[in-house]
UniProtKB/Swiss-Prot annotation:
Protein source organism: Prochlorococcus marinus (strain SARG / CCMP1375 / SS120)
PROSITE patterns for this protein: AA_TRNA_LIGASE_II_ALA (PS50860)
EC identifiers of the protein: 6.1.1.7
GO cellular component: cytosol
Gene name in the database record: alaS
Name of the protein described by the UniProt record: Alanine--tRNA ligase
């Protein structure tokens, strides 16, 4: 296979993150790869908490446990890793959430093709200069070196052999394994090839990893060649975006930078003017918000266990870093809106689930803010008193009472040169779990024992709720706090059993009814009980609720009234669920079977066995079918028959469900026929409307559709109509004109922005030219160190770069100033060094950091360019004096 080689002066492409993603996938699709969508962050692998690598969804294939229909696939996989969470924001490239582009071969092509295509993609598609690429290989992989050197034509001095720790992949102590080869981008090839240190992240960044699975390792450690070799590759999207967009770090790419701009707008600052410490908090917020949005979108809820704890830890880290930069009010949803907007084209399910995501963010943020201030005060007190260690008991109190993840306490302690006694923390945690387990067992067993006992004494409840929503009944049993009682009073949370009831008890996926139970008390005042749930226990219906008024006594006659609105909503959702299963069988696959369901008052959820996502076109077809059946006004036929008769007439049963000899069959004539004990509408027209909200995968071979019906659709439409009305008022336009107005406004903003940037650049370049006569010449070099106030961060960077370009390779330029003369708390410093200055041992990033500290800030960057911020303009002249002193000492 011939590989076209570009000349060393080829132009590197400037591509957006979306364009990079599409270019990668299309490149491999053109070479016979099936494009597969990203798997969920919640993996179908009990050994792994979260999806941490692009290859993880294909792990069963690589291990030989599962066949893959296609021998070649390519994907962009969303991933989360938290093992380096403390480095997020502090380095240029660490993230918790990232996207991994990959191409995979399952026993098809191997090393030569993988290397050739990786090079072709890097050079021909992305336009990387070959002289900027360094290759690493496993120390014993002569085959890979021969391909890189002789087939591709890479300079042997830019092929680096590495040991097993760095360049040999394995799935575990035994199993498939093999060498890998990595492509690094060299930001400074002018520094030569004498001492290439790939761990120098100011010069090199790994952007593509090729794993050659060619061996199997047995229990004795012996390697044998695999009959079918596999390829597993990974290219970090954020890293490639940094390279192609020519920015200092991953966070300044178009994938993340809009998040930083949004954060800056919340506290009315310019991101580029900030010091390194504050920028680090911005990056933590931006990165973690991306992770949280995707975790919630994939069904994870904040909790103290497993994935839920990862989400909670990330969310609370975001809130804390928000406080560090001056944000005291809830703000997560505002950042999440931008995150969803940035990622919705690649992950449309985020848009579908945005309200769910926002609700979870609001819930968790509000919960943490309620205790954060008190927790911070306690922590501040601990920090001031602790000589070197925060005790485990104190850390546990912060965790248990104030919601501080212990990792967050560790992080804050480290910032103050302290540590947390983790052994003591774990001891306190274990003790609390022991107490909680004991208490929970006592309460749960006591309540369940009591319920079981009273049910066995009073017998089954006669359910009349199919025919009526009101019914007189008699109290057979009262349970208060797990104890069987003769009566209950105002404020008691109770469970009561009646001899008959119109309340539907939770079952068959349908939620139990809610409503009111009332009676005349002994003092003739009305007893009123709000029922919030009803469940079935051995044929008895247990009604749970709160006594709002009066006294209820065992044996009292009561009036039961089901909340008719809630019941109608549940009925509409339940019948809609039956229609949904019928539509799936008709529009997608007749072999689809139910895996589970939830029928709530405001929504429905249907889980089904299916191997792939349901397409957008199929979902649209399903909606049309269901709304068509609704408008056709089918009258339901509900009947009881023997299980054998039900099977004979073709009624669908839930696999694994136990049925009696007599079953209830719900028939929507010509559409659906199912065994079901739930409540339903009498005619499909009562449903009104049906709308699918989301379709996702929840496990291997199981998909989930969430939808709304009836009133839920009206609420959904009203919410959207409200948004349209607000936009109409803001734009002073009719609803059908809004899209055109938004497009026109965006075009106008772009045009004005270009004019503003052009004007700023013109001013900057004019000032730059006037500074050239202030250059100071030394023996073999020259420098310019000046103050330049009233110039924006972007403009001052442009000035510095222009001056270095014009002055030449032996020039060092450092400019600093207040970008806004009305703001006495902002300073920006920028340095740029020519190649000869770097060769003399100066590094712009390392040089500028200590200078910025004088102004109360910090910063850094690459050897040839760096920027920093500060908060004290009064010290700026002192900082520039130190810069001159150090330049002269180093160069003269």
């Amino acid at each position: 296979m011939a590989v076209e080689r570009l000349s060393s002066n080829s132009e590197m492409k400037s591509l957006t993150g979306e364009e990079i993603r599409a270019a990668f996938l299309n490149f491999y699709a053109e070479r016979g790869h099936e494009i597969v969508p990203s798997a969920s962050l919640v993996p179908n692998d009990p050994t792994v908490l979260l999806t941490i690598a692009g290859m993880l969804p294909f792990k069963p294939v690589f291990l030989g446990h599962q066949d893959r229909p296609s021998a070649r696939v390519t994907s962009c996989q969303k991933c989360i890793r938290t093992n380096d969470i403390e480095n997020v924001g502090r380095t240029a490239r660490h993230h918790t959430f990232f996207e991994m582009l990959g191409n995979f071969s399952f026993g098809d092509y191997f090393k030569k093709e993988a290397i050739q295509w990786a090079w072709e993609l890097s050079i021909n598609v992305f336009g990387l200069n070959p002289s900027h690429i360094v290759i690493s290989i496993f120390r014993e992989d002569d085959e890979a070196e021969q391909i890189w050197r002789d087939v591709i034509g890479v300079n042997p001095r830019r092929i680096i052999r590495m040991d097993e720790k760095d360049n040999f992949w394995s799935s575990g102590p035994t199993g498939p394994c093999g060498p890998c080869s990595e492509l690094y981008y060299d930001f400074h090839p002018e520094l030569g090839e004498e001492e290439i240190d790939l761990e120098d992240d100011t010069r090199f960044i790994e952007f593509y990893n090729l794993v050659f699975m060619q061996y199997n390792r047995n229990s004795s450690g012996t390697l044998t060649s695999l009959a079918n070799c596999n390829i597993d590759t990974g290219m970090g999207l954020e890293r490639m975006a940094q390279i192609l967009q020519g920015v200092a770090n991953n966070y300044e790419t178009d994938l993340i930078y809009p998040l930083l701009e949004k954060i800056a707008s919340l506290i009315d600052v310019q991101y580029e003017d900030l010091n390194a410490t504050i920028k680090a908090s911005f990056k933590v917020i931006g990165d973690h918000t991306r992770a949280c949005v995707h975790l919630i979108g994939d069904g994870v809820s904040a909790s103290n266990l497993g994935r839920g704890y990862v989400l909670r830890r990330l969310l609370r880290r975001v809130v804390r870093h928000g406080r560090l930069i001056g944000i005291t009010k809830p703000f997560l949803v505002q950042i999440a809106e931008v995150a969803i907007e940035l990622m919705q084209s690649a992950y449309p399910q985020l848009l579908e689930r945005r309200q769910l995501i926002f609700k979870e963010l609001q819930r968790e943020e509000t919960r943490f803010l309620e205790t954060l201030e008190k927790g911070e005060k306690l922590l501040a007190e601990l920090l001031s008193k602790a000589p070197s260690v925060i005790t485990g008991e104190a850390a546990f109190e912060l965790y248990d009472t104030y919601g501080f993840p212990v990792e967050l306490t560790e992080e804050i302690a480290e910032e103050n040169d302290l540590r947390v006694d983790m052994k003591g923390f774990k001891k306190a945690m274990d003790e609390q779990r022991r107490r909680a387990k004991s208490a929970a067992m006592t309460i749960d067993l006591t309540l369940q024992d009591t319920i079981d006992k009273v049910v066995s004494e009073v017998g089954e409840t006669n359910f009349l709720g199919y025919q009526q929503l009101e019914q007189f009944s008699q109290v057979q049993a009262i349970v208060v706090n797990g104890v069987s009682s003769q009566e209950c009073n105002v404020g008691d949370k109770i469970d009561i059993v009646l001899n008959m009831t119109p309340f539907y008890g939770e079952g068959g996926g349908q939620i139990g009814d809610r409503g009111i139970i009332s009676s005349a008390s002994s003092d003739d005042s009305e007893c009123l009980i709000e029922i919030d749930s009803v469940r079935r226990v051995k044929g008895a219906f247990v009604h749970s609720g709160l006594v709002k008024n009066g006294v209820l006594t065992l044996g009292d006659n009561v009036q039961c009234t089901v909340d008719s609105f809630s019941r109608r909503c549940a009925q509409a959702n339940h019948t809609a669920t039956h229609l949904l299963q019928a539509a799936l069988k008709k529009a997608v696959d007749s072999d689809i079977t139910q895996a589970g369901s939830l029928v709530d008052f405001d929504r429905l959820r249907f889980d089904f066995h299916f191997v792939r996502p349901v397409s957008g076109a199929e979902l649209e077809h399903i909606e049309k079918l269901i709304n068509g059946w609704i408008s056709e006004a089918h009258s339901l036929v509900i009947s009881e028959m023997s299980i054998n008769e039900a099977k004979r007439v073709g009624a669908i049963a839930m696999f694994g469900e136990k049925y009696g000899e007599v079953v209830r069959v719900v028939d929507v004539p010509g559409v659906s026929k199912e065994l079901c004990g739930g409540t339903h509408v009498t005619n499909t027209a009562e449903i009104g409307l049906f709308k699918i909200v989301s379709e996702t995968g929840i496990a291997a071979g199981i998909r989930r559709i969430e939808a709304i019906a009836g009133q839920g659709v009206l609420d959904y439409l009203n919410d959207r109509d409200g948004v349209v009305k607000i936009l109409s008022e803001r734009f002073k336009a009719q609803s059908n004109e809004i899209v055109d107005r938004v497009i026109a406004l965006q075009d106008e903003v772009k045009s004005l922005t270009k004019l503003l940037v052009k004007a700023q650049d013109e001013v900057a370049f004019t000032k730059a030219l006037s500074l050239k006569n202030k250059v100071v010449s030394l023996t073999n070099s020259q420098y310019l160190i000046e103050r330049l106030d009233g110039v924006t961060g972007d403009a001052i960077q442009s000035v510095v770069k222009t001056l270095v370009d014009e002055l030449g390779d032996n020039a060092a330029v450092v400019l600093a100033g207040m970008p806004d003369l009305n703001d006495q708390k902002k300073v920006i410093l920028v340095a740029a060094f020519g190649s000869e200055i770097i060769a003399q041992g100066l590094h712009a990033g390392q040089f500028l950091g200590p200078i910025a500290e004088i102004c109360g800030g910090g910063g850094g960057g690459r050897p040839n360019f760096a920027q920093a911020g500060g908060r004290d303009p009064t010290k700026l002249d002192d900082a520039l004096d130190l810069a001159k002193e150090r330049i002269i000492q180093s160069l003269d």
